[in-house]
Amino acid sequence: MGWEYGIKVADVKDIKVLMDRLAEALPRIDGYRMQRKKDGFILLQNNPDWPEALQVSVEEARNMEGLKDDEPYIYCLFHIGGEDAVKWRECMYRVLEEEECAAEWFEL
């Protein structure tokens, strides 16, 4: 599949703000475009066989260690690897470090 991560946010009210910050902070790289959705965003690439590069959305936990069932968290699925994905992941780490809300990055 790809790299899968979650972001647990201490206060559910902070999820939307954090999602917006993540979307705004990602470096713009030629060949990709962002599509905003109600529950997150997707970075699409110019590849008809595999258009999704990165998906970030709000999901509800089910049988996940460290989260209660139905607890919302931010789901991050990197459909691709390589240099571009590493740049996005590092940028997302920095956003979490800079944000005032309590958020924890974890690997799925």
Describe the residue ranges of each PLM region.
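Hydrophobic transmembrane signal anchors and adjacent membrane-proximal interface regions, especially
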Residues: 7-8, 34, 41-43, 56, ...
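Acidic, proline/glycine-rich low-complexity IDRs
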Residues: 19-24, 28, 79, 83-108
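Terminal, regulation- and interaction-focused segments at domain boundaries
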Residues: 1-15
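Short, intrinsically disordered low-complexity segments
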Residues: 13-83
